A protein has these predicted regions:
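Residue-level signal for the nucleotide or nucleotide-sugar donor/cofactor binding architecture
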Residues: 2
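C-terminal cap/loop subdomain of S1 sulfatases and analogous C-terminal strand-loop tails that border
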Residues: 5-8, 13-81, 85, 103, ...
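Intrinsically disordered, low-complexity polar regions and short flexible loop motifs
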Residues: 88
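Phosphate-coordinating loops and pocket residues in cytosolic domains that bind phosphorylated ligands
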Residues: 94-97
Length: 126
């Protein structure tokens, strides 16, 4: 899994410039060379702050893995959504209250908290 935060360290490495230790992303060069580094991320964290805006998507943050996505909408609402992306790639069926996903939900909540701390986005960490 790659993110836009990976571009800066990739370009810096390509230019032969030392990548600052506090940069959040990882260089994509190993992946571009066909090698997956040990410990490469298995999940992505994102935080969407802009609302209202043209797209009218409410403020939210979330975590995504290959099979699942957990989202928390906040500010003027407090709503959680969990999607099984293998069964529902269009994210049309929220399974947050489905008992069959209780273990997945707990794992995703733990991963979300871990990533919020890692990226120092801790205003919403409980």
């Amino acid at each position: 899994m790659v993110q836009n935060i990976d571009y800066a360290p990739t370009f810096l490495e390509l230019a032969g410039v030392k990548v600052p230790e506090d940069i959040q992303g990882e260089s994509l060069l190993p992946l571009l060379k066909g090698k997956k580094p040990a410990g490469w991320r298995k999940s992505l964290y994102y935080h969407f702050y802009e609302y209202p805006a043209e797209h009218m998507v409410k403020r939210h943050y979330g975590v995504r893995t290959d099979p699942y996505k957990l989202i928390h909408f906040y500010n003027d609402i407090d709503a959680w959504e969990l999607y099984d992306l293998e069964k529902d790639p269009a994210e049309m069926h929220n399974v947050i209250n489905d008992p069959a996903y209780s273990e997945v939900l707990a794992d995703m909540q733990a991963e979300l908290k871990k990533l919020q701390i890692q990226y120092n986005d801790t205003d919403f960490v409980k």
